[in-house]
Amino acid sequence: MTAAPARFPGRAPIDAYGNGGFRFAGMSHRGSILCLPSGIYAWSPADPLDRSSLSSALAEKDAMQLLILGTGAQHAEPSATVKRVFADAGIGLEVMNTGAACRTYNVLLGERRAVGAALVAVP
């Protein structure tokens, strides 16, 4: 699965999350998002998460050293296959609930790190 056209070109911190969406760069978005070096995109991940759900992130491997995966309200480990795909691509994968993922992404973005985030929306 590839991401939809960029909702916001470029990088921006996540200002708020909850109620099924996110706020960033003075905008709000309903649903899950991918925050990649090239922009912020609407994202409809498979359940359970699979490689095709993260293909857009993998396509930016040269610009990203780490992907923060926010799995929703609760922490949920991705499959060994998903972990292996990221390891093989040379991208670190950190998994946590979406709230922690937003905070971690913002800190690393503020440090100008080569980071991305795949964030599942929470109610």
Features from the language model and the residues they span:
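Non-catalytic interface/targeting segments
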Residues: 1-52, 110-122
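A short, acidic, amphipathic alpha-helical segment used as a generic capping/interface helix at domain edges
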Residues: 49-61
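Short active-site-adjacent helix-start/loop capping segments
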Residues: 42-44, 75-78, 103-104
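Mid-chain, well-packed structural core segment of small domains
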Residues: 61-96
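C-terminal structural segments of small proteins and small subunits
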Residues: 92-120
